[in-house]
């Protein structure tokens, strides 16, 4: 991969100032103060909120505590989506800090998966990495790794260790020089305006004539409404990690540098702010 390490670091160390507030319906023995935290964009809510959980449990009776879950303006937050994706999709036009409501009861079974332990997060994360490598290298790279390499990827994410993670992850970002890129680009496109969870299709980074496909090429093929407004007026923002990459950016470069730790490009299509 081309080595733009500063870009990789900027992506890894992206943070979202967040204010956690206990839901007013929760029964407490005394008033619960809000809890402030800088959330890592590349991580998962249930992986980085142990302190939040402990903070609010201090003011509650044990019998009133069941599984923790989070909500933003009425929308339950999926723990298996990266934090940065959740923010871009649901709150990117709102003022900071991001105001998240904490719940310990009335778990929304229809909207959220249960997260019984960190093992569930690890299993989800490794499943995504394996799926991404199946697309990129027919699973050859991830299958040739030892179990300790898989563990190092997970521990690097869990403990926020950039160098530990990238020492292994860089192998997943390599490809034979003669091929100019991966077999297919692992991506998922999310929209708030549709019930469909996300769009995911096979898409090659290089065209048949050898030209590098761009972000714009991908969107025109799999989500044309995002880039081709009927009246010519820009209706949407295309966001990855809180920024709007130029549509001319080669998809291969984006995949190497702006993928989340699970090796997917998580792309948010959100309505253009009206103000």
UniProtKB/Swiss-Prot annotation:
Keywords assigned: Acetylation, Apoptosis, Autophagy, Cytoplasm, Immunity, Isopeptide bond, Membrane, Ubl conjugation
Cysteines engaged in disulfide bonds, as pairs: none
Matches recorded under Pfam families: ATG5_HBR, ATG5_UblA, ATG5_UblB
Post-translational modification (record): Conjugated to ATG12; which is essential for autophagy, but is not required for association with isolation membrane.
Topology with respect to the bilayer: Peripheral membrane protein
Gene Ontology cellular component annotations, sorted alphabetically: Atg12-Atg5-Atg16 complex; autophagosome; axon; axoneme; glutamatergic synapse; mitochondria-associated endoplasmic reticulum membrane contact site; phagophore; phagophore assembly site membrane
Cross-link (Glycyl lysine isopeptide (Lys-Gly) (interchain with G-Cter in ATG12)) at residue(s): 130
Signal peptide boundaries: none
Chain segments annotated as transmembrane: none
Biological processes per GO annotation: aggrephagy; antigen processing and presentation of endogenous antigen; autophagosome assembly; autophagy; autophagy of mitochondrion; axonal transport; blood vessel remodeling; cardiac muscle cell apoptotic process
Subcellular location: Cytoplasm; Preautophagosomal structure membrane
Lineage top rank: taxon: Eukaryota
GO molecular function, one term: Atg8-family ligase activity
InterPro entries in the record: Atg5, ATG5_HBR, Atg5_HR, ATG5_UblA, Atg5_UblA_dom_sf, ATG5_UblB
N-acetylmethionine: residues carrying this PTM: 1
Quaternary structure (record): Forms a conjugate with ATG12. Part of the minor complex composed of 4 sets of ATG12-ATG5 and ATG16L1 (400 kDa); this complex interacts with ATG3 leading to disruption of ATG7 interaction and promotion of ATG8-like proteins lipidation. Forms an 800-kDa complex composed of ATG12-ATG5 and ATG16L2. The ATG12-ATG5 conjugate interacts with RAB33A; this interaction is bridged by ATG16L1 and promotes ATG12-ATG5-ATG16L1 complex recruitment to phagophores. Interacts with TECPR1; the interaction is direct and does not take place when ATG16L1 is associated with the ATG5-ATG12 conjugate.
PANTHER family, A to Z: AUTOPHAGY PROTEIN 5
Function: Involved in autophagic vesicle formation. Conjugation with ATG12, through a ubiquitin-like conjugating system involving ATG7 as an E1-like activating enzyme and ATG10 as an E2-like conjugating enzyme, is essential for its function. The ATG12-ATG5 conjugate acts as an E3-like enzyme which is required for lipidation of ATG8 family proteins and their association to the vesicle membranes. Involved in mitochondrial quality control after oxidative damage, and in subsequent cellular longevity.
Stated family: Belongs to the ATG5 family.
Protein name: Autophagy protein 5
UniProt source species: Pongo abelii
């Amino acid at each position: 991969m081309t080595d733009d390490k500063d870009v990789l670091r900027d992506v890894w160390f992206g943070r979202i100032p967040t204010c956690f507030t206990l839901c007013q319906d929760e029964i407490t023995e005394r008033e619960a103060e809000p809890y402030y935290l800088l959330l890592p964009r590349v991580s998962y809510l249930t992986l980085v909120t142990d302190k939040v959980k402990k903070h609010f449990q201090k003011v509650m009776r044990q019998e009133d505590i069941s599984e923790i879950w989070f909500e933003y303006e009425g929308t339950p937050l999926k723990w298996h989506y990266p934090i940065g994706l959740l923010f871009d999709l649901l709150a990117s036009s709102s003022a900071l800090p991001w105001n998240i409501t904490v719940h310990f009861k009335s778990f929304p079974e229809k909207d959220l998966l249960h997260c019984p332990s960190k093992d569930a997060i690890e299993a989800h994360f490794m499943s995504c990495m394996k799926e991404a490598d199946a697309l990129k290298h027919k699973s050859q790279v991830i299958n040739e790794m030892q179990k300790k390499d898989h563990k190092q990827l997970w521990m690097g994410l869990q403990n926020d260790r950039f160098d530990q993670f990238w020492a292994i992850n860089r192998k997943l970002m390599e490809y034979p020089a003669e091929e100019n890129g991966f077999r297919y680009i692992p991506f998922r496109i999310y929209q708030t305006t549709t019930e469909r969870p996300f769009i995911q299709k096979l898409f090659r980074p290089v065209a048949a004539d050898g030209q590098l496909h761009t972000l714009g090429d991908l969107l025109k093929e799999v989500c044309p409404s995002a880039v081709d407004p009927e009246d010519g007026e820009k209706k949407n923002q295309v966001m990855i990690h809180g920024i709007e990459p130029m549509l001319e950016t080669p998809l291969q470069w984006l995949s190497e540098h702006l993928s989340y730790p699970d090796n997917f490009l998580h792309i948010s299509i959100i309505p253009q702010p009206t103000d």
